């Protein structure tokens, strides 16, 4: 049941989630999704409702950060197309679990995937933050450009005719063949446990070679596309609670404005530190 206390709690949760999605591009799923489960919503309803509220705030955040020149629109659109395929596959996995094991099964699935994903990605990002912080300190307070990983240099060096697109964020041509698995994995996690940005953002940084600021902003474009498709897919299953989605959206639209403004005052390594701390 939805009372006044629960409604206010969801709005506050939305504010925090909105700040996170604008700041680090992760969608902040680890905030509203567990909160909805804690308040009694089944795992599949929590994930579906989060996806429903995600695409409007992602659009707002993308437009806001594009004004600051932080969004690689072309890359975001291409990754978003492949992510939509992952969304559809993830939805089928979730509904199969629901049909086989009920609400308890979806709760366990969401919780287990959260723990594994956040631990692995968070640890990797925190390690990279320490390297960037050391470079920044060595530069006497002036922000140093993040060095490309060996993998990113290799990906940017591969030229496959007929598959290349120019990425403003990476300032290099990238093969679409490398974007397929990144987009699909991002979409799968977004649809299964609503945390696609935890794969998409680090992948754009460490595999494609985008700066953290641009990767987190570009993820908002992907989140919009995934959220729109996911809402339709889950809506057809009848598991979207529009009340939960709208209350969280109400708070997140305010929070996303604060988060977007905040990114103009932080350094690249500070974005990665925030990502790592929140994940872990």
What do the PLM-derived regions correspond to, one by one?
Residues 9-17, 21, 25, 29, ...:
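Alpha-helical transmembrane segments in multi-pass membrane proteins
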Residues 25, 42, 72, 98, ...:
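A helix-boundary/kink motif common to multi-pass secondary transporters
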Residues 57-68, 225-241:
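Membrane-interface helix-cap regions at the ends of transmembrane helices
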Residues 46-47, 76, 198, 215, ...:
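Alpha-helical transmembrane segments and their helix-entry boundary regions
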Residues 6, 42-55, 216-220, 238-252:
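Structural signature of hydrophobic alpha-helical transmembrane segments
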Residues 1-13, 67-185, 236-280:
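Juxtamembrane transmembrane-helix boundary motif
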Residues 58-61, 118-121, 125, 223-230, ...:
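Helical transmembrane-bundle signal
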